[in-house]
């Protein structure tokens, strides 16, 4: 089922949580909503589910306007961060709940509901736990029961709010791979919220980066990482360093020296240069480069991360050096960014 | 830790590393013995001096049986009424924000504080055939004051806060997400309340019921004013005990008291077992 969010605005007591957000989700896609807390990602997810009503704008499921439908009619599967399982029901009863509350002829017979529940338990690899109560399960198992419960109603869309947020790192990684498998097998259109970029980039077909109630960028992991379209995305996704620079005659200047990068299409004047610390070319001499003194140096896994003080302003930037590089305290290092991007100074 | 025996036989479950288990357990036992156990065993001992035949004669006396039936029956009915409306009051107080909510909240506790005799007299005045409410009920043929129905009304008044105050905190802890989850799964409002919310509240409701019930069985002050106290019809067991005392018939008084004690204990024990069972299941 395609989902289209059209110019949605949401205010909570006059405070805007989302400004004019539009998003197209293709059928069968796995989409991540990524952003820091307060960016509106959970609000957007809850609007799609119908747990909140938009102040303005519409949400379409396929060609149908879903914004006027109640939560019950929307037929979405929602998985909550803290699972929200029904404590007084067994695992099987939890999973069958959505079918049991149906009315009249749309309610399958009890036998069928039981069969469906154990089928879903097989799918989430928890066969044999039908009779357990949620209190008797581990966090990862509860999360899987919550997912099975959401899938039992054959939802048009599957929505997950920080699905792995409350689990430890090991279980998270496992469940992540497993969710991808389930998605590939069942083909539900799936939207999940996360603040963990690794999770978003690894798992999703497309990532929606959000900040302060707006969508900053939508794209594949490659798009988002390699060509961020705003300073926020550059800073939020992956490591980045930035320097205040000036653009004159299509050349980039740091203080009073050109650094050997040309930007013929950039507007003249103050700007900020962004680059990845690991994507730099080290130089020996320095005519047209960035040079600085090493202020601090740390060993990070396979590389060495150094902080350089640049120019009279003592601007600090981080770059990565090979472990064997002789740069020690106070020594000078010259480099030029490989892939970089300029954004006009705010 | 000199009080925790480590020898053979059964052992205490190893308490936490925080010291004080021996002291606090010892104090609790001593305190409960002094406050509850000694007075009650005195009661049993006194009634035991009767001998079986005499005890049985008192226990099987029509008047005693009727009084016990009225006491336990009305207390049960009143507790049942309180469970329904007490839960409703708690729901309103927890779920809705309205002007005067704090005042209503405070009002719930009034039956705790008010002298029971005052409550009894006030209720009698209202429900008497010429009282404000009694006057309205009279043409319908409903007589409240001076009947068992009046006893139920008094016990409902006395027992309400027990239900509200036990259910309210548990209701406040209900996770919003659980309701939302049920809604996304297609459950309507009624189904959410009956299938998701109330089963979770059941242990608290049972506790509230047993407290209101226990209070109702023992209630004296408010009931004697409204009950009319007709032997065999609207005479409660506690009153019968007082009557026997006034006749200096101490053995009979203690015998009735011992029967009440035994019945109450059994009922509260059953309620407790139900609680433990449901807690074990739902964790």
From Swiss-Prot, chain A:
Main location: membrane
NAD as UniProt keyword: no
Record flagged with keyword Transcription regulation: no
Domain of life the protein comes from: Bacteria
Domain ABC transporter: 3-237
Reaction equations catalysed: sulfate(out) + ATP + H2O = sulfate(in) + ADP + phosphate + H(+); thiosulfate(out) + ATP + H2O = thiosulfate(in) + ADP + phosphate + H(+)
Enzyme Commission number(s): 7.3.2.3
Subunit structure: The complex is composed of two ATP-binding proteins (CysA), two transmembrane proteins (CysT and CysW) and a solute-binding protein (CysP).
Function: Part of the ABC transporter complex CysAWTP involved in sulfate/thiosulfate import. Responsible for energy coupling to the transport system.
Protein name, UniProt field: Sulfate/thiosulfate import ATP-binding protein CysA
Organism placement in taxonomy: Bacteria, Pseudomonadati, Pseudomonadota, Alphaproteobacteria, Hyphomicrobiales
